């Protein structure tokens, strides 16, 4: 089994590297050494109960994907500890020049192999789905798939598999229905409740979320590695955008709308597939320099987030409630990001490890990410993302597809953005 071979090869490489530094590592960093061993112990336990053969039954596949994803995550965590630059510098003290180079070479190999691991569970999900198709199954029991997906750990790979199942075997009504079930599970809503209670609970839970959190995305900021020369007169952080583990919940609807855009406008199917990749593919977590400084307000909120406007068109729009605010904000951010992506589609295919954004030097215009929700319950994220001439490229893209039935722009921050979202 290929995925098992990849893990075995990675563990062998990790063992080879650790033998070179283990004694010094153990003495200098006892707490990290302990954590490193704990990760490997958990890997051993998970491998023992994860068979090589991919299960055929849908009620087993989601647990299986969860196990593989945990194994890969644990190995990445363990290797990240042991190959960190600080630990390497401490260990290399007193080594000869050639020996230091060999150690760095081993660390680089491990670093590269980490990204292979991050795709393994996704590849298993794709293999499982392709097997179902090849077996000639004209229809899958979506009800059972929904139960198993919503009752087990949700991972990026299981979300991708579930989405593919819905599109391959479900009608439009079934896609909507089972997407709502996933949404209710995410928002902790009991299906037995009345619709009024469900709606009230969902709105309350959404109101406590940052809009990006409602999309299933979270930001993490760390200190920068940037060259001091680049930091003059500005504050810079590294911003990481991890893949959403709940991507099925909020992105299926977007994909359905994009399919409508494709049908109405003849949008290239490869670009449509690329949208899908942005939404559902877990790959390298790219770091992007981000300035924490005032800039052009793409979205600005006042009166506790009840209204918003954009300076470039000086429009002001009422937002009825938290769900509507999330909807407007999601579409604004998604469309801005997608416009950058499409402009660089060819380059992206050549450099997929830069998902979902290119490095900061490829971006020129600032996009201030200001939360729609105010108050003390959620921190305000004010990361200014550099976007590759967002407004210019987005306008050109919208003119090229010319969809026929744009949604009411009153729920979006700009009429230009509404053209991507169809009823």
Curated annotation (Swiss-Prot):
Primary subcellular site in the record, as a coarse category: virion
Superkingdom, natural source: Viruses
Assigned keywords, A-Z: Late protein, Virion
Cell compartments where the protein resides: Virion
Entry's Gene Ontology cellular component terms: virion component
Induction or repression: Expressed in the late phase of the viral replicative cycle.
Family of the protein in this entry: Belongs to the asfivirus E423R family.
Name listed for the protein in its UniProt record: Uncharacterized protein E423R
Source organism of this protein record: African swine fever virus (isolate Tick/Malawi/Lil 20-1/1983) (ASFV)
């Amino acid at each position: 089994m290929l995925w098992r071979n990849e893990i075995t090869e990675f563990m062998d490489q990790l063992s080879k590297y650790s033998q070179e530094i283990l004694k010094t590592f153990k003495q200098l960093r006892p707490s990290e050494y302990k954590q490193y061993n704990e990760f490997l112990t958990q890997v051993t336990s998970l491998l023992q109960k994860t068979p090589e053969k991919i299960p055929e039954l849908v009620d087993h596949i989601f647990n299986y994907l969860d196990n593989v994803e945990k194994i890969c995550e644990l190995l990445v965590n363990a290797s990240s500890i042991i190959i960190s630059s600080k630990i390497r510098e401490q260990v290399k003290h007193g080594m000869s020049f050639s020996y230091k180079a060999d150690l760095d070479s081993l660390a680089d190999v491990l670093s590269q192999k980490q990204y292979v691991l991050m795709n393994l569970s996704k590849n298993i999900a794709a293999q499982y789905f392709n097997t179902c198709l090849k077996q000639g199954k004209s229809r899958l029991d979506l009800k059972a798939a929904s139960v198993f997906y919503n009752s087990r750990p949700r991972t990026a790979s299981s979300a991708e598999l579930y989405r593919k199942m819905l599109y391959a075997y479900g009608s439009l009504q079934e896609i909507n229905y089972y997407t709502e079930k996933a949404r209710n599970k995410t928002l902790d809503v009991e299906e037995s409740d009345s619709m009024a209670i469900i709606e009230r609970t969902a709105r309350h839970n959404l109101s406590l979320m940052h809009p990006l959190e409602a999309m299933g995305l979270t930001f993490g900021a760390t200190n920068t590695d940037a060259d001091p020369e680049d930091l003059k007169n500005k504050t810079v952080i590294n911003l990481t955008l991890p893949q959403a583990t709940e991507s099925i919940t909020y992105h299926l609807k977007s994909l359905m709308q994009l399919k409508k855009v494709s049908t109405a406008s003849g949008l290239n199917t490869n670009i449509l597939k690329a949208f899908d990749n942005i939404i559902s593919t877990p790959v390298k977590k790219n770091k992007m320099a981000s300035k924490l400084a005032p800039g052009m307000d793409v979205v600005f909120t006042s009166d506790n987030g009840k209204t918003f406007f954009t300076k470039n068109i000086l429009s002001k729009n009422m937002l009825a409630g938290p769900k509507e605010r999330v909807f407007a904000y999601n579409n604004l951010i998604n469309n801005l990001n997608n416009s950058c992506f499409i402009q660089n589609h060819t380059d992206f295919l050549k450099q997929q490890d830069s998902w979902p954004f290119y490095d900061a030097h490829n971006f020129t215009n600032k996009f201030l990410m200001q939360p729609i929700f105010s108050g003390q319950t959620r921190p305000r994220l004010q990361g200014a993302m550099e976007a590759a001439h967002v407004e210019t490229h987005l306008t050109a893209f919208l003119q090229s597809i010319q969809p026929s039935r744009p949604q009411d722009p009153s729920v979006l921050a700009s009429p230009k953005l509404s053209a991507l979202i169809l009823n």
